[in-house]
Every structure is written in C-alpha cells, then in structure tokens.
Amino acid sequence: MISDQDADRPRWAPDGKRFAFVSNKEKGSQIWVADFDGASGTVTAKHRLTNIATEASGELWSPDGKNILFKSDVYPECDATPAKESACNAKKVDEARNSKVKAQIFTHLLYRHWNAYKEGKQTHLFVIPVEGCTTNHVGRGALTRAGELYSPDAAQSAAGRVGAPAPTRDEKGSGPCSVARDLTPGDYDAPVFSLGGQDNYAFSPDRQEICYASNHDREPAISTNNDLFTVPVRVGAGDSPAQVLAATKDITSENKAADNTPLYSPDGKYIAYRAQQRPGYESDRWRLMLYDRKTAKTYDTLRGDLDRWVGSFTWAPDSKAIYLSTEDKGESPIRYFFVGGDLFGEKHDASDAQQTGSQQEKHKFIEQEWARLYSVEVEGGYNDDLTIVGNGTRLLFTRMSISAPNEIQVLSIRRPTIEPKRPFDVGATPIVLTRLNDSVLSQVSMSPLESFWFPGANGDKVQGFLVRPPNFDPNKKYPVKFLIHGGPQGAWGDDWSYRWNPELFAAPTSSGPGYVVIMINFHGSTGYGQKFIDAINGDWGGAAFEDLMKGLDYAEQHYPFIDKDRESALGASYGGYMANWIIGHTNRFKCIVSHDGMFNTESAWGDTEELWFNEWEFKGTPYANREQYRKWSPHLSATNFKTPTLVVHGQLDYRLDVSQGFDLFTTLQRQGVPSKMLYFPDEGHWVLKPQNSQVWYKTVNDWVDQWVGK
C-alpha cells in the first residue's frame, strides 16, 4: 500500500478508513496519515501529520479517531505552553546540529541507553488533532492538508504561491491548527523506554484520559520503579505544564517495583497492566493486575496462581475476559480467564426470583472460576500480538516457529453463553491469513525443533533443544554448534529470529554438510517458573554452567550422530559471558565465539547504563560486595585460556561496553591464544543492519569451520 517511502508501525483509525504510520521521508521520523479505499484496497492519499523538530514515533489513535498520541524525545527545560515549547525544542535542535562543539555534560546517570546518548532529552507524550491543519511548529511553518509548507509569516506557501490562504493558529495552540500538546512535561521519560511489544501508554475508551508508565525515582539507573500515571487529555485553557502536572495522578505509587503496559477495559471500568513485586529486579514475575477506576483498588487477577510471566494481553470487547500469552517450556501458548465474580467482591444471589436458571448458573460459575486459566488450543510455536475483532467472535494473533517467521492467524471464538464445562467454544484450527514468506521458505530446507530433558544442577529437570542439519543422514557424524542464550533470564524456544537463527547455524557450509545445533535452557531461563529463574541470581557461573555441561553430555550420549570431538560454543550477551567463563573452565570445545559478553564484572558495572541489573545479579556494588563480583568474573581465569576464540562487539553497545570485548581480545592475544575480533563501529548490543548481519554470519561460520568443520 505504501511503496514510495519507508513506512513503519501502521495503525488503523477506529473507522478503518485511514491508517497512521511512521516515516523518515521528510523532516526525520514523523507521523503520516493515509486515506484507504477498502473497496479497491488502495491508498488514495497520504500526508505528513507532524512536523516536530525532535521527531515523532509510536503513534496511537484516540478511540474517536480525532486525535493521535505520539512520542518525541524533547528537552525538558523547554516545558511551556504548546507553541513556546515547540519553538524552544526547534531552536535547541538547530543549535545542536549546527554547533562545532559536540561535548556533553552529565549531571546524573542513565545519560545513555542501549545504543544512543540521551543528549539531555526525555521522552514525552504529545497529542495532536488529525483533522484540519497539520502543523505543530509555530514560527517554523505550517503544513496544509496537502502537505505544503507555509513560511513563518504565512505570506506564501512552499510552492511559491504568494497570498495562498494561511492556516489559522494562536499562541495557546487552539483552533484548527493546534500545535501538538505535551501531556507528560517534566524531567522524566514518560513513557519509559520499551523494546517492543505492547505500548507503555493508552487512551481511555471515552478518549478523555491517557495512562502511561514513567519512573520518577531520583536515580532511575538503579530503579525499576515504573509507575502508572493518568492525565486528562485536556486540562484547561492553555494546557500549561503546571496545569498538566496538577491533573496527573500516580495510580500505582504503593508498588515500588515495575508497572507497565496499561490497557483500559472497553467499558472503561478498569485498567489492566503488568506488574512485578520486587524492586530493582527486572526479571521478577510479570503479573496481570487490574486497577478499578471507580474505587482506586488494585487486584492481582490470577492471585499468583500462574507461575509464568504474562506477555501480551487484550480485552474481550464486552470486558468480561482477558486473553494473554505466556512463555512456557519453549513455547508461548494463548490463555484466557474471566473478569468478575469474587475478584471484585461481587456476589450473585442464585435464589433471585428475577434470574433465569441459565443466569444463575452463569453467575455461580463466574464466582467460582474467575481465576481459572483456559487454554486456546494453538499447538506449538510462539503466539503473540493478540487482538479481538468481529464483535468478540475472532481472535487475531501472530504466530511463528523456529522454521517460519511471524504470520497473522485468526481463530473463531463463539461465546453465546458461559457454561461451566466449556465457557468458550473455540475453533480448533486457526486460519492463516498471511503467507508473506511462503515463496522464500519453499526454497529452503529446515529441520524441526526437537526437545529433550535431562537432570541438571541440583537434580532439577532441565530442557534442551536440538536442530539437525538439512538432508540429515543418521549414519553420518556431525560437528556441533552449542548455542548459549542471553539474558540470562531468556530462553531458547520454537520461535524465529534472523539473529542467532539455529536453522542458519545448522545449514551446510563450504566445509561440510552442516551442523547439529544444541541449545540448553539452563537455570535462570524463562518459561519454567520463577524459582528456576531466580536460581541464577548471584550464581552466574554456577548452576547454569553445570546445566550446560550436563546437557551437552546428555546429547552426546543419546544422539549417536554427534561428533563429540568437533564441538564449538557460541553465545551473546549473557551467552557471551558464559562463553568467556567456559574458556577459563573447560577445554572440551574446539573453538569459541563470544559476542558482546561481560569479561570483567567489576569494570562492566561502571560501564553499563542500567545499574539495577548488575547490582541485583551480583548483590550490590563492586566496592560493597567485591567478593561476589570477583567470584564470577571470567577475566580472573585468563591464565587458563587456550581455546581459539572469536570476539565480536559493537561500538554502540552501552549495555555491555565495547571495552569488555577489547579487554577479552587483548587478553587472548597476550596469552598467545588463536583469536580474532570482529568489530562493528555502527552496531549496538545486536547486529541489526542487513549487510552487517551477512558479515557477522560469514565471519562466525568461517571461524567455526576453521576449527571444527573439517
């Protein structure tokens, strides 16, 4: 539908006649709106909605389709009335762009995040009307609906037509040419940073209010205390920062751990959101909570009975049920539960003469079963991005597996009544709506993911996975690529990624017919309960290392086609840390690949941005708990290093600074260990650029082939 410019994050308007998207075609990242003809399936017109100097992203339609909420990284000292704030930000952007001095001054931590310096900016939420004039820069020109840019004095358009009718506007941002209004002023990220998934902000159904997540603690670098805040969309004439802040309400202040991803119920009574309970611990269990907007009470919907992390979730249109995804043993099933009954203290009198027998049974059932999870029978794979459509009769979701990227599927849901035995009548087989990758996948041979279990550390059952090479011959012996996941609170599973893709690692290379890929979900992995996750806290090289070695032992003993004399180990992030730990604690591998791994735990604490992570995992700071840091630091085993190692690191990795990679490579070279370093000056914690990804795969596979493949 959009082929003449880049387009990202498409979002349909409530009426289905338009959609918004983000594009870098003009003025950097901006919000665009396209008119859509449903009959022909084509875009009939499109225009740029925003013209904000600090750029725009993350658009979200209001329920009535009249406004769009979006994010922009702005200078908090510019907080003022909408017009003045916009002009102030534009001036600062111009000054920074044109200045020959690039020095920065930091007065607090978290001055950089993931792969970028914050440059004194904070993320704020803005709202802008969709209809009429599409400006949001007073004094910088205004866009007509056709996208022409008026000069600051409105005397002529960019097309040069002197006397063209200028859009009206005023200092306060009222009228048909209203500038975008900042709904989250202050020196905070509001909303907080998100790596994807559900937004950390939402509109109320009546469009009068928004809810968003923000951390207002004095030092966010050591805090996970994201709270949920609500604020009216309009707070008064002028919408000054003082007015907005006075009308803003913190609804989760009692919880000192993280709250995020708010989502209003369609009837407007509740806000559902995810929450953790332990402050400072980013890998605590994500629970699904409900905030009652009338009583201001908060409820744990499943009362702690689900020992899994709640992923994405969505409301049924009648607000009676919530659908959610949960990671479980390498898969992500879809589940649902009822909202009502004794969860909110509601009691239904079954003897009420006005109730029919079916109504009495329905009420009784909800009282008893509100917390029971029911499964939507979608076998295997990872299911996510849940949406209910068709007046509650269809469930849309994305599904992927290790051998196929995401596609959109739909499942029929017929719910005429609520019955104890089968409250929802769920269609048995989803219908695949998109097949965007079929033509490519038909040309590629891939193997299914095989699961195995073995006794790991502490006698606990641990799950592993295996992928055979294409055109597998059981009579042959195959070398091994032993992949170690990051996190450490992450997991391997039946999902797809172009980064660290097990199918690509299993594929034939110039040196042979392919590799057996083995992956272990060691203690600390997600999808096996919170106790299993917590086991790695303060024990980075302990049970996890034991699980990995025992898992590989098990595979060697039970899969005779594995050549145990030709094994390699590869890991990134925590997997890179474990690769570094392995170099100093075993010589069983012919070669190692360490990508963005922690090498010196003490210096890594000072280099990282999210200090809460290191201080939780190593139980404090290096100067307060030096013994713990040194116990698990790979660099202290450097005299044992012998295994040929490829080091990979990106200059823009601020989670694990590039100095960790340089330190490792220097140590390997000084120890006389065969080693090589692949350095990306333009990548962060992940290698994301397609051409860089090709270089990454070739370099990694060539390294393994050199030491293992032949």
Where are these regions (language model features)?
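A flexible loop/linker signature enriched in serine peptidases of the S9 family
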Residues: 1-9, 20-32, 51-57, 71-124, ...
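Residue-level detector of Asp-centered blade-edge/turn motifs that repeat once per structural unit
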Residues: 14-15, 63-64, 205-206, 266-267, ...
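Hydrophobic beta-strand positions that form the internal "hydrophobic ladder"
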Residues: 16-20, 68, 210, 268-271, ...
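Short loop/turn segments that connect beta-strands within beta-propeller blades
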Residues: 35-40, 130-133, 233-235, 293-296, ...
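Intrinsic, low-complexity polybasic segments
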Residues: 136-165, 174, 235-239, 341-353, ...
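Cap/lid segment of the alpha/beta-hydrolase catalytic domain
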Residues: 424-430, 434-565, 572, 604-606, ...
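Active-site-proximal cap/loop segments of hydrolase catalytic domains
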Residues: 483, 508, 519-710
